[in-house]
Amino acid sequence: MKTMVKVRTYILAGAIGIFAFTAFGGSARANPKTGEAEFKEYCSACHFDGGNLINPAKTLSKIDREKNGVKSVKDIIKIMRKPGEGMSMFDEKTLPETDANKIAEYIINTFK
């Protein structure tokens, strides 16, 4: 009898967990993060205020970006996917294309 109660409890707990995961997972997609929020999550530790803790010659300012051949959203995403020495790689599994685009657009529009 006690075993049956435990089994029911585990089944109920699992069902509630699945429901909560799908319910809240769906709401997260309905309210996507902004480029600024994505930047803060993935980039700001090394690129605080558009700087560069690892390589100060490669900040996110327009002047430094252009000096280093980074002129477009596509160029920024290319670096995210295959970065140089000292930068973490953000593949599509880690950072989906839509989020990478938001970050790149945020960089271009924010760091002049």
Residue ranges and their predicted role:
Residues 1-31, 106-112:
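Post-cleavage N-terminal segment of exported redox proteins
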Residues 24, 37-40:
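Processing junctions and N-termini across compartments
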Residues 25, 67, 94:
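Residue-level detector of flexible, active-site-proximal loop/helix-junction positions
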Residues 26, 48, 92:
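Short, conserved catalytic or interaction motifs in soluble domains
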Residues 32, 36, 48-78:
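Gly/Gly-Pro-rich "capping" loops immediately C-terminal to redox-active cysteine motifs
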Residues 39-49, 103, 107:
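The canonical Cys-X-X-Cys-His
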Residues 54-64, 79-112:
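Axial heme c-ligation environment in periplasmic c-type cytochrome domains
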